[in-house]
Amino acid sequence: MYIVFEGIDGAGKSTQINLLKDWLDQNGFDVETVVEPTDSEVGKLIRKILQRPDATTDRIQKTLGLLFAADRMLIMDKLNDDSKVILSDRSFISSLAYQEPAEWIEQINKYAKEPDLVLLLDVDVKTSVNRCSKEDEFENEEFLSKVKANYLDLISNFNHEIIDASTGVNKVSTDIKKAVAPYMGICPDCIR
């Protein structure tokens, strides 16, 4: 099972992935987590480029698009391991939400694995910006408003659940467990 957490920066993806991993581990599942960008050499290069002041320019965005697609290809074996539950902090869907043009992003990611379930953590842009570290050029209201709109437009193309990520860590975690439970053969009504 390949479950992807998506959402704008500051939505709480990392926190919620860890909480879901712990819960699934406790329920006897073999769980592995991945983060995009990865810790590969390509992923490290992506992280470095994201810090550049010109990271939002068209040229750098296209470069990042290619690098993210390459980084994804490096983890395909892990994503295709059906013996594990894979929880991913982002996927090619992030590239579709964050980068342009969409047709080109789709083309360079045509071999990316499609998630079995996408959990879109939805949070207000102002809340997101307040939660962010302000480490890169993308953590601003104008840009994140556009990205959020992109997510909401494209999410219907995937098997998904939209989770209100503004309700507090515990409530969000419970909502995620209830969304994931049926896929894992767990009674969602038994989750509190």
Curated annotation (Swiss-Prot):
The reaction(s) this protein catalyses: dTMP + ATP = dTDP + ADP
Name this protein carries in UniProt: Probable thymidylate kinase
UniProt-listed Enzyme Commission number(s): 2.7.4.9
GO biological process: dTDP biosynthetic process; dTTP biosynthetic process; dUDP biosynthetic process
Cleavable signal peptide: none
Cystine crosslinks: none
Record-listed ATP binding positions: G7, I8, D9, G10, A11, G12, K13, S14
Coiled coil, from the record: none
Keyword vocabulary terms for this entry: ATP-binding, Kinase, Nucleotide biosynthesis, Nucleotide-binding, Transferase
One Pfam family this sequence matches: Thymidylate_kin
Gene3D superfamilies: P-loop containing nucleotide triphosphate hydrolases
InterPro entries found in the cross-reference section: P-loop_NTPase (IPR027417), Thymidylate_kin-like_dom (IPR039430), Thymidylate_kin_CS (IPR018095), Thymidylate_kinase (IPR018094)
Cited PROSITE patterns: THYMIDYLATE_KINASE
Family according to the record: Belongs to the thymidylate kinase family.
MF (Gene Ontology): ATP binding; dTMP kinase activity
GO cellular component, one term: cytoplasm
